[in-house]
Structure formats: structure tokens, C-alpha cells
Amino acid sequence: MRTVVWQSLSEEQQDAILERPAIAEGANITAAVADVIAKVRTQGDAALLELTEKFDRVKPESIRVPSKEINAASERLSAEMKQALEQAYSNIAKFHKAQKPQPIKVETQPGVMCEQVTRPIQKVGLYIPGGSAPLPSTVLMLGVPAKIAGCRKVVLCSPPPIADEILYVAKLCGIDEVYNVGGGQAVAAMAYGTKSVSKVDKIFGPGNAYVTEAKRQVSNDFRGAAIDMPAGPSEVLVIADETADPDFIAADLLSQAEHGPDSQVVLVTPSPIVADQVTDAVQRQLKALSRADIAQKALASSLIIISESITQAVSISNYYGPEHLIVQTKNPRELLPLLDNAGSIFLGDWSPESAGDYASGTNHVLPTYGYTRTYSSLGLADFSKRMTVQELSAEGLQNLAPTVVTMAEAEGLDAHKRAVTIRVEKLTQNR
């Protein structure tokens, strides 16, 4: 990790120092994904089976996972694992149930009633990556709010063979259908539908560059599907003062660095002593990690920033807008009102990022790569949509008519004006 003194940098250097590592996109990925999507749209299930065998080197017996296979997953898991998953489920459900929106009903003037109502998105698709380690936590983070929101159909795609933990949590969440499909072909199948895979209205979940590009492409097609949010590499920023525990900070930085070589970790502190202690602790703890080589690559593009004060550290954090923000200071809650841009915030020594990643109850699907300035952490609202309602009485329309007519005339929209005056004339005739 590189250490820099913030005040010694010019404004241009400060901007440059906080730039994220570039995301490798490339025309080859764009073209390859477009080909996969086109193949799935034209060949349907046959394309899914062919691409699964090609990319995953597996030939599933069926695209949809049978119920008996999902039920059998429970028998192969330890009691300890099931208890952990159920505890996480309980906490995540509690927090997301509390997010249920309340209807709004306001009489803006006599006889003019305005309302806001919320309805669930009818059909949603969840993408769960494969790889060397299963991600049942992501199933929880997507499946729990989808069901609480009331989505009528919730389906899940994951590359085969699907881990027992994922199948168990899918059943725990009440997910309707699980498919043995991964990669960009899974995104295409959910966006456009095949004989076996249900078409959905919105797709959620992380993935590699091909999955991310597939989500982008289908979301740009009105016949495709909406997506949750733009994706980018994982990141964490820690604000720490002289009271912070350097071993805790190092552990938090490394827990993010081990996600991938493109992850970025940043420490901002006014204490050079803490900075040095954290540097030593990172090197010491790194040796014990099974993914040390991955974490080491991430650390190469990571930073320790020496700020003038905690106030300046907050400003740096707000400018950077991290996915995860950890505050290890004497009075961390006092800083909360000053923090504007972050996906999820972890206050105090006893709030490691890992808690939020798995089981505290908050959602771990978060905006990254600076999108925290405009995007929120995933929640119940992402699985719903709002509608407004207005109901005017005869008296209400008469009272509002002069305002609407004047504005319609100013905009040159005669039919808008007439839709009001024709009603007012009718009311006048009926008196």
C-alpha cells in the first residue's frame, strides 16, 4: 500500500490519487456477449445447453433444477451451516420488512386528492455467480427482499453444478424456480425467456465482466429487462483516528482486498502512527491468508492517506464515495450526519464489514466505483415501483381549472386546455 500526505498534493494530484483502477471492458467482451445474447434469443434452450457445456464444462440433465434436488441439498448440509444461514435470513428479513413503504394520501387543495401507492415488480430474476466458493449470502440479499416486496415470480440462475448452500437458501427464501445456467447466457435467458426459463422484468445480482456486460446490453433493449445497478470492483475506505485498533483496520482492509485483484482499499487517518501500525499489521496478517496472492495484487493499487484532521478525512471519503465505509474513531456516530456518499457504513470498532456482508441484516449489494453519489444500497424499494393517483371532485376541478388552463395556453397545448374547459362548461350547464 502506498502512503501519501494529502496536503502535500496538488488538486490535480488529489484527483488522480483517488481514481479507481480501470475496468477492463474491451470490444471483444462486448461483441462476445452480443453473440451469446443473439444465440439464446434465436435458439433458446438448445443454446443454453450448448453454452453451458462450452463454458462450464458441465452437461446438466435439465435446465431447471428439480424440486427433489433442491430438497436433497438440506440433507447434505451440516446443522451448523443451516443454523448460520437461518440466522442470517432472520436478520435480513427483519431489516427489510421494516422498509415496507407507507401509502401517501394528501388533499393538495379542496377537492383535489393525490396519492402514492407501491406495487411489487411482478417477475424478477436473480443471478448468483459460481466459482470456487458458493455465495449463499447473495441469494439471501436478493431473495429475501424480493419475497417481502411481494414479487409474484422469483427465479434464480447459477452456473452448474449449483452448491447445496445455494439450493438450500433458495428454498428458504421461497424462490420459485432455479436454473442450471450461468454467465451472459443466463442473463439473456431471463431477459428474453426460453421454453424452460421464465422471462423477467428486472435482473439482480453480481457477476464477472461478461455477466455485467450482458446486463448492460439487455437493459438497453426495451424488449429486454431492467437491472439493479451498475457494477464495479469491490472497495472499502476506513476513516480512523489515533484511538483505532490497527489490527482491526488491517483485517478489514484485507477482507476487502481478498475479493479480487481489482478491489481497492483505502485508509484515511490524521495519525501517521496509526498509518505505520496498519502497514505493519497488513503485512503480518497477509501471510496467513489463503488468498494472499489475490489480496497482494489489490493492495498494489490501494492507499493510506494522511489527512490533516478527521474533518478532512470525512471530506476525502465523501469525494471518493466508497462502497463500504468503516469509521473507527472515538465517537463514530458523531460523524454519521457528515457522511454523504457510501454504499454501507460500519460504525465503531465492533462493526466489521464482514458482519454486513453476511448477517447483520443490511444488504450487501451496493453501488461501487463512485456510483454512491447517485445510487443507494439495494433494498425493498428496488423490487417495487411507485404509482401516483389523483382524484378530483367537480368542485376541485373548477377551482384548479384556471391554473391548468393558463399553463396549457403558455405551452401551446390546446387539447390539454380543452380537456379541462369541456368539463367546466358541462358543470356550468348542469347548474
Curated annotation (Swiss-Prot):
- Single GO MF descriptor: zinc ion binding
How the cofactor is bound: the record states: Binds 1 zinc ion per subunit.
One BP term from GO = L-histidine biosynthetic process
Necessary cofactors: Zn(2+)
Kindly list the positions annotated as binding Zn(2+): Q256, H259, D357, H416
Pathway involvement of the protein, from the record:
Amino-acid biosynthesis; L-histidine biosynthesis; L-histidine from 5-phospho-alpha-D-ribose 1-diphosphate: step 9/9
Provide the binding site for substrate: S234, Q256, H259, H324, D357, E411, H416
Q: Which family does it belong to?
A: Belongs to the histidinol dehydrogenase family.
Instruction: Briefly state the protein's biological role.
Output: Catalyzes the sequential NAD-dependent oxidations of L-histidinol to L-histidinaldehyde and then to L-histidine.
Q: Which HAMAP family match?
A: HisD (MF_01024)
What protein name does the entry list?
A: Histidinol dehydrogenase
Q: What organism, scientifically named, is this protein from? A: Vibrio parahaemolyticus serotype O3:K6 (strain RIMD 2210633)
Q: What is the lineage of its organism?
A: Bacteria, Pseudomonadati, Pseudomonadota, Gammaproteobacteria, Vibrionales
Query: What gene is behind this protein?
Result: hisD
